[in-house]
A protein has these predicted regions:
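Pre-Walker A (pre-P-loop) alpha-helix and adjacent loop at the N terminus of AAA/AAA+ ATPase modules
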Residues: 2-44
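Conserved alpha-helical scaffold flanking the Walker A/P-loop in AAA+ ATPase domains
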Residues: 24-28, 81-101, 130
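Walker A/P-loop
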Residues: 27-67
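Walker B catalytic acidic pair
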Residues: 40, 103-104, 115
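P-loop (Walker A) phosphate-binding loop of NTP-binding proteins
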Residues: 41, 75, 143
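AAA+/P-loop NTPase substrate/partner-engagement loops
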Residues: 56-84
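Canonical AAA+ ATPase core
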Residues: 82-87, 108-112, 120-211, 252-254
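C-terminal engagement/docking regions of AAA+ P-loop ATPases
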Residues: 231-305
Length: 305
């Protein structure tokens, strides 16, 4: 099925120009059964990326636009009394979809954010005293504004850690933007996309990711990166055990996308920026450090096995 994964990447790259690496990161996060946070400016393609993944993978898609007056029931669903039967019937909310775009999640209140994050973590929803499983596969792509354009309720560190990866799309380069201006309307391109996989095949791939071999030396390498982040005076706190698990899972997924059944150090390095940078908070010293700066610093500090 690696050919199908390459087809997904190629198809998405024709719609989202010049962002193949970010597309691969998003796909790796999905294959690793994680959830993705995109922190970037409006208009750079966050919604388009979610739409393209949903169409290419044949997934049921729902966009939730978060606002400050949104309630948990608006996401999870609500029971409504039906006069004919004399009973309450549960009406599922938009969370009961396979791919969710949680747009501007930092606009919602902490209570509503917690409802989303519980569903992400548990793959189930508890509403009206009853627990209901969410569909498989289940993937959340959440967006929030950059730190200098914070919303009403920025996600706290403990909730940021629930996202397996965080990426930035950034502005397209000059050639990609020119091609975007001269090309076909993106909405028309998305509507014309054909599924490269079906949900059942995607679930099978997610199971196969767990079987990608990680040599003991690679486990040592991952542990060394995590331990260095904890000892380093550059960071307020280091990477958690959850981050180490995420790094391992995403490296396995990246290796699968590359068509291999084993993980190389290059796979760990490729996914490290997405896994680590939203979990690491540099000590403020007047120097602004980008996500890539942080990842490069970790890679350079830890010898490759």
């Amino acid at each position: 099925m690696s050919l199908s994964l390459n087809h997904v990447i190629q198809q998405a790259s024709r719609v989202i120009l010049g962002k193949e690496r970010q597309i691969r990161m998003a796909l790796a996060c999905l294959l690793a059964r994680g959830h993705l946070l995109i922190e970037d400016l409006p208009g750079v393609g966050k919604t388009t990326l979610a739409h393209v993944l949903a169409r290419s993978l044949g997934l049921q898609f729902h966009r939730i636009q978060f606002t400050s007056d949104m309630l948990p029931a608006d996401i999870l669903g609500v029971s409504i009394y039906e006069r004919d039967s004399g009973t309450f019937k549960f009406h599922p909310g938009p969370i009961f979809s396979q791919l969710i775009l949680a747009d501007e999640v930092n606009r919602a209140t902490p209570k509503t954010q917690s409802a989303l994050l519980e569903a992400m973590e548990e793959h189930q929803v508890t509403a009206e005293g009853e627990t209901r499983r969410l569909p498989e596969p289940f993937f959340v792509v959440a967006t929030q504004n950059p730190s200098h354009q914070v919303g009403t309720f920025p996600l706290p560190e403990s909730q940021l850690d629930r996202f397996q990866m965080r990426i930035e799309l950034g502005y397209p380069d000059r050639d990609a933007e020119r091609a975007l201006l001269q090309g076909v309307e993106r909405r028309d391109m998305i509507a014309a996309l054909e599924p490269c996989l079906n949900p059942g095949e995607l679930v099978e791939l997610q199971q196969n990711v767990k079987r990608v071999h990680v040599a003991p030396a690679l486990f040592d390498y991952i542990q060394a990166i995590v331990e260095h982040s904890r000892r380093s005076p550059e960071f307020v706190t280091g990477l958690s055990p959850r981050a180490a698990l995420a790094l391992t899972a995403c490296a396995r997924a990246w290796a699968m996308i590359e068509g291999r059944d084993h993980v190389l150090p290059e796979d760990v390095q490729a996914v490290l920026p997405g896994v680590a940078t939203h979990r690491l908070h540099p000590v403020v010293n007047g120097v602004r450090r980008t996500s890539s700066d942080i990842a490069v610093g970790l890679v350079e500090a830890v010898p490759i096995p």
